Each structure stands twice: as C-alpha cells, then as structure tokens.
Amino acid sequence: MLRKFKISIDGKEYLVEMEEISESSVPAATPITPTTENTRAASDQKQQSQTPSPAATASAANTMPAPMPGTILKVLVNVGDTVSENQPLMILEAMKMENEIVAGMAGTVSAIHVSSGQTVNAGDNLITIA
C-alpha cells in the first residue's frame, strides 16, 4: 500500500510516496519518481526576478562566493596577482573532499576575504577580482 507524506528538509518541502513493506508483501515493480513542492521558494524567486536588487552590480559579479559550506585549506593566490578565467584560486574542503575554487573571470585579485583554516558558509565572499 502506497502512502504519501510531505517532508521538509532545510526549508524545502518534498512530496514522497512510501510503500509499507511486510514479510508477505511484494516490492513495487516500478520506481517512484520524487516530486518537489517548492511553493515558497518559487514565490520568492518570482519576487526576486521582478525586482532587480541593487546588490547585483558589477562589483557583486566580481566577488567569488563559496559554493558550499566547508573549510579553506589553501589560498593559492595573493592580492595583486593576475589570474585567468578558470584558474584555481583556493582549495575548499567540504564533506572530506577537496574542491578547487576557480576564477569566474580574468582579472587582478583585489581582495581575499578568507584565510587558510577558516570555516565558510555557502554564499560567503571568498575573493574579489577586479
């Protein structure tokens, strides 16, 4: 017997179907495709897309944000260094894996907002390229 549940994980709501299994029951023949109910997130996105934010300026585009929470292992560049697009800037450890943070554009490093060993959250400013 399939039963539907709505669960919330990190603020996102998911609609899931679960099958009750007993020793005498037979497993379902077809896999169930998960569906997402993001009504709150969708309405937030519509509001954001309708009103351009003043923070979306050229300087915001030059700042590299952390893609995920983790710890900065190494900073590979210094302020004043010239970098090319896709050049590794630093190493971020997340979930016991090392991830390269690469330059999204060519330019000169004008500021480094983190140091080795520092813990960062997703979206934190890491480095600014001018």
UniProtKB/Swiss-Prot annotation:
InterPro entries in alphabetical order: Biotin_BS, Biotin_Carboxyl_Carrier/Decarb, Biotin_lipoyl, Single_hybrid_motif
- GO BP annotations, alphabetical order: fatty acid biosynthetic process
Q: Where is the composition biased (Low complexity)?
A: 47-64
Which sequence positions carry the modification called N6-biotinyllysine? K96
* Polar residues bias (residue ranges): 23-46
Q: Which UniProt keywords apply?
A: Biotin, Fatty acid biosynthesis, Fatty acid metabolism, Lipid biosynthesis, Lipid metabolism
Q: Where is the Biotinyl-binding domain?
A: 55-130
Q: Where is this region: Disordered?
A: 20-64
Q: Which CDD domains match?
A: biotinyl_domain
Q: Which PANTHER family match?
A: OXALOACETATE DECARBOXYLASE ALPHA CHAIN
Spell out the protein name for this chain. Biotin carboxyl carrier protein
